[in-house]
């Protein structure tokens, strides 16, 4: 019933959000990276800027701006989840502070990792098109991995939102259409690997 669904509404929402992020964020991060660097590519303005500042300082400024925008995106997503719960009158309590911090921290980490991979492509190739193509491909691969065995997702970085998620389906009653959710432990090794990969991609573009 509708009342029963509201008692597990946040579980359903947080189960679905990583899938939505897998669809939207690879392309969104590609657009963000390409637009940040494309501003300087057009007209060869980097050659002028390099007379005033170092290449690394210019890249650091672009990366910092990108991280700030990603943080804003994640905060808006977090606020949106609260707003949805309020407007739809969810009866299930919002996830505990530690659980919510982990979920949004994972979202931020994966976004940053994808962003730095796209920024690296844009800087190396001086062309935003390859980054956009990789973003589209990443969306398709990430979504495809969601319907494959769990181990496949570990080889698809664009879809790390899903294996990092702690909300899983425990049971689905086909007759009543009732879904039961469960919470699994935090995926710390994968989160650490995501942060390390983001750092490697950043320094690869930095140097």
What label would you give each PLM region?
Residues 38-41, 45, 84-92, 125, ...:
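Membrane-interfacial segments
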Residues 110, 127-130, 154:
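Short amphipathic alpha-helix initiation/capping segments at coil-to-helix junctions
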Residues 34-68:
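Helix-loop-helix units of permease transmembrane domains in multi-pass membrane transporters
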Residues 45-46, 120, 158-160:
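Tryptophan-centric aromatic hotspots in well-structured domains and transmembrane helices
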Residues 58, 130-132:
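Alpha-helical transmembrane segments and their helix-entry boundary regions
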Residues 1-29, 33, 60-125, 143, ...:
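Secretory targeting signals
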Residues 25-41, 115-129, 194-207:
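Transmembrane alpha-helical segments in integral membrane proteins
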